[in-house]
Amino acid sequence: MDEMEDFFENDELDREPSPMGDEAIEDNSGEGGTRRVVEPKLLRTKRLANPRLALNERILTGPKGISALRETLKDFKPNPKDDPYANLEKLMKKYAYWGHLMFPKMKTEDVLNRVETLGTRRQVKVFMIKHRLGETGEDSEHEEQENQKNGIIDDGASDNDDDLFKDLPEKEVTTEKAKNSEKSDQKTAEIDENVEEEYRMMEEERLREEQEAKEAADEDALMEDFGDMNNDW
């Protein structure tokens, strides 16, 4: 019996170290008081090396979004003498190129559907108004990115309430805001009128082309009927 105990004791001494090191524990709760080593399971934490990006308002209003689309379509002039479908195909190729540069992981159809959905968001609407007025807001966006990069959060905690309103002229500020608001409303109304006028002209052009295509089809049908009559004679 002593020889068996010596054998097992030596086996315990000669056992290779556990890969878990100090985390291995001994369990003495088995039957007969036998000792066995119980190693805890490895806990694998799921970490995302590259978080999944989504096409959102920030990307659409960024440098690769609407601003890039305007540059892409800047030199595009459809030829009224060409086939409308050919002009449409050229336009869609430019949209596809823009969508690929903005968000390469999505198909063109999905990008356009997503852009249509984002167009109803307040942030995108405000950006469009500012963009039409020539106020892109790149400086404020750049400043915000720099603050986020440096870990600076402006919560107004360091501002003194007395200093905030110390040099604030009440009447002048109110009058200036009212004037700026009126100018902004006038510019927005002018832009809306221009957009409506362009849309009306495009709609008239489309109807005219449809009418011409219909008349051409009627003439072709008439010529075919005339040819059939000659063949019958």
From Swiss-Prot:
Localization terms from the record: Cytoplasm; Nucleus
Organism domain of life: Eukaryota
InterPro entries: Csm3, TIPIN/Csm3/Swi3
One GO-annotated biological process of the protein: replication fork processing
First-listed, main subcellular location of the protein, grouped into a coarse class: cytoplasm
A GO CC term assigned to this protein in UniProt: replication fork protection complex
Record field: compositional bias (Basic and acidic residues): 163-190, 197-216
Keyword DNA repair recorded: no
Disordered as annotated region, ranges: 1-39, 134-233
Bias kind Acidic residues: ranges: 1-14, 217-227
Keywords annotated in UniProt: Cell cycle, Cell division, Cytoplasm, DNA damage, Mitosis, Nucleus
GO molecular function: DNA binding
Entry annotated with the keyword Transferase: no
Function: Required for normal progression of S-phase. Important for cell survival after DNA damage or replication stress.
Family: Belongs to the CSM3 family.
Protein name per the record: Protein TIPIN homolog
Native species: Caenorhabditis elegans
